[in-house]
Every structure is written in structure tokens, then in C-alpha cells.
Amino acid sequence: MTRSLKKNPFVANHLLKKIDKLNTKAEKEIIVTWSRASTIIPTMIGHTIGIHNGKEHLPIYITDRMVGHKLGEFAPTLNFRGHAKSDNRSRR
């Protein structure tokens, strides 16, 4: 279910402050965050954000096509390695 249009998109306050501070300094550095639920807004374009996937922070470069999506969509938490292989040789 999508968020109501009369509400603003959710962005964590600490993340918004970090982005505004970097925009005023015009410097590029990785912003580390655990807020996967934050929505990508146009002021984030051009920044690299380290999004936590439960184990480590994955650096994601924000482009204009990502606006409106959540940060967590770009940092997968599960790593599917395939189904267990059947070992028929050990059964014989």
C-alpha cells in the first residue's frame, strides 16, 4: 500500500541533516545509514549512501531514476546461494 499523497515522503531526520550539510559544503563522501525505510528525494541525487543490509554497508550511488523509491530496495538482505545439492554418492 502506498503512502497518502497529503503526507510527505518519509526521510529520517539524521539522514536529511547529513545530506543538507554535504550539499552546502559541496563535498562528496559516503553517508552511512541504517534507515532503509527512507524515501529517496531529489536532494540526494549525486550522493553515495552506505545502506545497511544487516551485515555491512553497501555503497549505492543515487541517480535521478531512483527518486521515489526506498533506500532498502537497493541493498538486498538475503543472499540466496541455491538449493542444497543432493549427494547421491554418500547414500550408496
Swiss-Prot record:
Domain of life of the organism encoding this protein: Eukaryota
Protein name: Small ribosomal subunit protein uS19c
Organism annotation: Coffea arabica
GO molecular function, one term: rRNA binding
A Gene Ontology cellular-component term: mitochondrial small ribosomal subunit
Reported function: Protein S19 forms a complex with S13 that binds strongly to the 16S ribosomal RNA.
Subcellular location: Plastid, Chloroplast
Gene (name only): rps19
Keywords: Chloroplast, Plastid, Ribonucleoprotein, Ribosomal protein, RNA-binding, rRNA-binding
Family annotation (PROSITE patterns): RIBOSOMAL_S19
The keyword Chloroplast belongs to this UniProt entry's keyword annotation: yes
Name of a matching Pfam family: Ribosomal_S19
InterPro entries, A to Z: Ribosomal_uS19, Ribosomal_uS19_bac-type, Ribosomal_uS19_CS, Ribosomal_uS19_SF
Family: Belongs to the universal ribosomal protein uS19 family.
GO biological process, one term: ribosomal small subunit assembly
